[in-house]
């Protein structure tokens, strides 16, 4: 850390992705835009190789810590097992886990130096399904891309929302 002009401490922040890159025009890019927009030049990112393993994710975390990161933003549920290891290995580092649940981490409690941010994808899906059915569409489908937990939850919500609207419409 270095001192800013008002004597304020600058915290070094790093962002790591479980898959993909920071210019994917999707989830990773949105996270990087937020972190770099807030931190300016005081942040770094670490991108996995294709088909990264838990060991590869641990290596990225280790590299971020070795580069001086005090806060590491870990993007993606695949970080679960790696966060369990990292939180114990680096108790003075704070971890912000995006789209990671306690179940993904696999511990009885979320580690005290880890903050998990999750989304309620099923609610957005419900609203989309409800709206499209209320708009009079009767032949609906859902193409979610990859069968990952967040997309599956969105799909469940979509079906439930469309069904609720259909029930109301008779």
Show the residue positions of the predicted features.
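A residue-level marker of the well-folded mature domains of exported/periplasmic proteins
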Residues: 2-170
């Amino acid at each position: 850390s270095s001192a800013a002009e008002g004597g304020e401490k600058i915290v070094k922040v790093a962002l790591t992705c479980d898959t993909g890159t920071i210019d994917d025009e999707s989830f990773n890019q949105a996270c990087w835009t937020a972190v770099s927009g807030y931190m300016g030049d005081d942040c770094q990112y670490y991108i996995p190789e294709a088909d990264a393993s838990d060991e590869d994710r641990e290596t990225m975390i280790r590299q971020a810590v070795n580069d001086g990161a005090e806060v590491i933003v870990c993007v993606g549920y695949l970080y679960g097992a790696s966060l369990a290891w990292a939180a114990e290995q680096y108790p003075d580092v704070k971890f912000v886990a995006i789209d990671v649940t306690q179940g993904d981490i696999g511990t009885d409690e979320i580690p005290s130096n880890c903050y998990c941010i999750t989304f309620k994808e099923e609610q957005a899906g419900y609203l989309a399904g409800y709206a499209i059915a209320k708009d009079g569409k009767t032949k609906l489908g859902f193409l979610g891309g990859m069968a990952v937990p967040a997309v599956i939850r969105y799909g469940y919500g979509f079906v439930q929302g469309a069904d609720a609207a259909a029930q109301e419409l008779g």
